Regions:
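C-terminal motif of bacterial Sec signal peptides marking the signal peptidase cleavage site
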Residues: 12-15
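Short, low-complexity, disordered segments immediately C-terminal to signal peptides
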Residues: 21-30
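Amphipathic hydrophobic-ligand
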Residues: 54-56, 77-83, 168-171, 194-197
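Mature, soluble, non-transmembrane domains
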Residues: 17-21, 93-94, 106-205
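An acidic-aromatic
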Residues: 71-119
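Positively charged n-region of N-terminal signal peptides that target proteins for export
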Residues: 1-4
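Post-signal-peptide N-terminal segment of Sec-exported extracytoplasmic proteins
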Residues: 36-71
Length: 205
């Protein structure tokens, strides 16, 4: 079914909603979160993306190049390309190609941040900090407005969810589940303030 992949991802995200109030200071190594950084050497996903009133489905190829640049190419199954992004090791980002319907600065900026979240990029450990509640550890990386937050169980063995927050509330929630050889089988991203969702399911090759 057309929305089956997105619906399953959003169900998981809805069950992982984070509450920032009542968090307590926690001790630990902020870099420990890097154990969950996906190893996208060459991964292919079935993708469904709802963005700016368009439903797009196809294949998303995520590949790490020899210089550690991560390349993301989203196309339909006939080979028509929707976008081609690259994320440099030094933090630079390039939109090498974007189809006309998506070639809008807010859309590209949003996709950039969403993918930076799941790639575990933009991590300034000088300003980052740990918090906890009764069930979870929160690895918080402040940015200009809000923060990137990675939430694990208290033992740090499972990534529960990832969030981009405004100063007041989460505005993006994401999950990565069922890792094999460092590659997640399922990835879901949803925005809480408007209709912008991404659902990915790994294709075995």
């Amino acid at each position: 079914m057309r929305y089956l992949l997105l619906s399953s991802c959003l169900f998981i995200l809805a069950s992982c909603s984070s509450v920032y109030k009542n968090l307590q200071p926690a001790t630990g190594d902020i870099n420990y979160i890097q154990k969950f950084k996906p190893n996208f050497n060459n991964a292919l996903y079935k993708a469904e993306i709802d963005v700016v009133g368009h439903h797009l489905s196809g294949l998303l190829l995520i590949k790490t190049l020899p210089d550690s640049t991560v390349r993301m190419v989203f196309s339909n199954e006939m080979g028509f390309k929707f976008f081609d992004f690259e994320f440099k090791q030094n933090g630079d980002f390039n939109a090498l190609y974007v189809v006309k319907q998506m070639d809008k600065k807010p859309v590209i900026k949003t996709l950039k941040k969403d993918f930076e979240l799941i790639l575990l990029l933009r991590k300034d450990t000088q300003t980052s900090y740990l918090r906890k509640d009764g069930n979870s550890l929160y690895y918080i990386f402040p940015k200009q407005k809000g923060s990137f937050c990675y939430i694990t169980d208290l033992g740090g063995s499972e990534m529960k969810t990832m969030e981009i927050s405004s100063p007041h509330k989460p505005i993006v929630q994401a999950i990565m589940k069922n890792y094999t050889d460092g590659i997640p089988d399922t990835i879901g991203i949803t925005h809480t303030n408007f209709n912008f969702t991404i659902g990915l399911k790994k294709i075995e090759r």
